[in-house]
Structures are given as structure tokens and as C-alpha cells.
Amino acid sequence: MIETIISSLAIRNHRFNPAAIERDLFDSFGSQRYVHLAFIVSSKTNELLSYSCNCKDGLLPYKRSLHAEDQALSILINKLVKKKMEFKNIRSGINVISLRITRNNEIKLALPCMRCYKRMMRNKNLINSVLWSDDDGNIISYKLTEMDIEKLKIRDSSGVRNRYQ
């Protein structure tokens, strides 16, 4: 399934084994009905630079999770800091792709939450576009600086909304 997604998005993938990505994805399911998956790709070459799945952090009493977009950005930044990747790979910017995949392999709505949107805005000099899946499996694309949080109905994640319940 991951190979199909990567090829349909025309992502060049020389760094990661699709079977390993798929294993990470399905290991993340646990008791969840779906998993969010985020890819970070080079705007210039469309090369896959980083990816991540959401996961429960288990550190807090409420059900907080590490969001895939946030984690994929952190992985990319860590690679740059530790010099495991050269800055020239992202000089022309990156695109963030967010997908939600159900246990039945359906692609559903994966609009980034408010927290992830704010994190991306703090890195707007690096991020060119944000792409996400809608409930029909289509990919929606916006330049980060042109995203309208009111029009797109970007809101807090369920973990933030349910924090004190």
C-alpha cells in the first residue's frame, strides 16, 4: 500500500524501504481505528526526506499523542543538526504531506490540527506547501502561507479538546 501511495504522489524514494514504512505504519495502529502518516519531501526533487506516524506518548494522563507532521519535522531537523543530511537537500524548501489511513486501507481526512499548523508556520521559511488527504481520498494542496485557518476549519486536535475531561 505504501508503495502505491508513494508512486501516486510521484515521491522519489531512495532513502527508505517502503516495507519498513508500512511496518512502522501498522505497528502504530495498536487499538486505534486509523493512523496519521506524514511525509516530508524536497520541493525541488520530490525526494522523500523524512516520514513519521502518530503515536501515543504515554507520558501524560490524558490521551496525548505525538502528531505525525510534528514528529516528521523533528526528525528532519535532527538529521540536519546531526549532519546526517546536507542543507542543500532542502535549500529550495520542503512539502509536508499528511495522510490518515484506516485499518481497511482507506485514505481519510488528514487536515493538520492547529498545533501542527502553528509549528509549520514557525518554519514557514522552510515549508513551501502542505498537502493532506480529504475524506474521499483526494489530495488537497495549499502553499503554507496561503492557508486560511477559518476557511479550512483548522482546529485543535481531539487530544487538546479532551485534555481535561
Language-model-detected regions and their locations in the chain:
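Zinc-dependent deaminase catalytic domain
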Residues: 1-165
